[in-house]
Amino acid sequence: MLEFMDYVQFAFYNATKWNYENSYSQLTATAKGLLDFETPGGLRFNLSSLSSPNFATSYALGSVGLVDGSLSYLYSSLPLRTTAQSAKIDLHEIIRGYRQIQELRRVDEPWMLEQWHGGRRIDKRDTLLYGRLYLPQSTLEALYLRRITPTQQVRITAVSDSRLRNGGTILALHQYDTGKYSTETLYSTDGGLLGLRGLYNFGPDPRKEVTEPPKQMPRIDDKFYGRFSAGAELYYGTLNKSGGVSVGGRFATLPAHRGIPLTATLTLNPLMGNISSTYAVRAGKNLSLCSRLDFNVYSYESDLVLGCELWKMRAPVEERRERSMEAKLAWRLDEVDLEKEKKPEEVAGVLKARVDQNLKVGLVWEGRVKELLFTLGTSIDMKRRDQPFRALGLELQYSS
């Protein structure tokens, strides 16, 4: 489950119309959401608030062996009109599971963001500032996020910690997204790392408008609607004189597909000899399955992980209505309004489970009780019969 500050940052992306999923770093996001979920350890409580559309605060207190916590503050120059109450937040927005790839949209033109007053431009670039202080470690995290143009964004993150080399590190990232393709250029002070990422989407170009009317063709209900994306990553450490490269591809069905939604990825690291393949499918309305196989061509070592996600919905409660006076006088029942809109199903909870080839199991139950969001999870090692439970934790979140 996302923390409140991460939820607010995604709200900033949506408000500025930035497609954070159109990136090579998000190529395997679906498999990570289904297989790499964190199991809480100990007891942790988060208290957050979006006190104004531009300012948010969050306080966390945990107990894992010793008492620790954190203080977080966030400022956005763009007012964020998003649901902040934990009792009303849509669980689909904070619980990361199977993610349906959406259709590519056309990026706004630069002139669409211009605002003029008295012959002068008064529009400003949308900016987000975020800081978090961990106690008692006195570790400080900071984030600077700024939209430059509709297709460009700058993201700078910094960590200050006495335990790190040189007392901290800074990571600068420049993102460029046209919809059809995206690139990312990064630099990190940790080892003088330079990197370049790119992702290309095959198929129609959202930047080109369709001027000719589509030809009349017979409808084919079983047509396969999907999109194939391919990308690569290249990085080099200027201090340690070492580098790396990876390539990958993804095929995912689109919302227009009438069949079972699925996502398949294949990534390759030729220098290390690692090959990773994932396959995720939404087997039912509330059930998703996923598998991942990692293989090294040099050592012949492999790793297999299986996972599932099950959404449990609350049973609808029918409203009891008394018969109208007109129906009583006519000795009949009221007519049933078949056109009445049905209320959306309410989520009771989400169960996530994974198991690897070493029989290590992870279980997480996430949901909402009254006005509290909760995450209950455990890690189990089936090979250790004496102490199978490795960790057990509960995390609570309240926001207003």
Curated annotation (Swiss-Prot):
Per its database record, what is this protein's job?
Answer: Component of the ERMES/MDM complex, which serves as a molecular tether to connect the endoplasmic reticulum and mitochondria. Components of this complex are involved in the control of mitochondrial shape and protein biogenesis and may function in phospholipid exchange. mdm10 is involved in the late assembly steps of the general translocase of the mitochondrial outer membrane (TOM complex). Functions in the tom40-specific route of the assembly of outer membrane beta-barrel proteins, including the association of tom40 with the receptor tom22 and small TOM proteins.
Look up keyword Transmembrane and say if it applies.
yes
| Protein name per its UniProtKB record | Mitochondrial distribution and morphology protein 10
The SS bond pairs are none
Subcellular localization, as worded in the UniProt entry: Mitochondrion outer membrane
SUBUNIT field:
Component of the ER-mitochondria encounter structure (ERMES) or MDM complex, composed of mmm1, mdm10, mdm12 and mdm34. Associates with the mitochondrial outer membrane sorting assembly machinery SAM(core) complex.
User: Which cellular component appears as one GO term in the record?
Assistant: ERMES complex
**UniProt comment concerning the protein's domains:** Lacks alpha-helical transmembrane segments, suggesting that it resides in the membrane via beta-sheet conformations similar to those predicted for other outer membrane proteins and porin.
The UniProt entry, under Gene3D superfamilies, shows: Porin
Q: Which organism is it from?
A: Sclerotinia sclerotiorum (strain ATCC 18683 / 1980 / Ss-1)
Family label: Belongs to the MDM10 family.
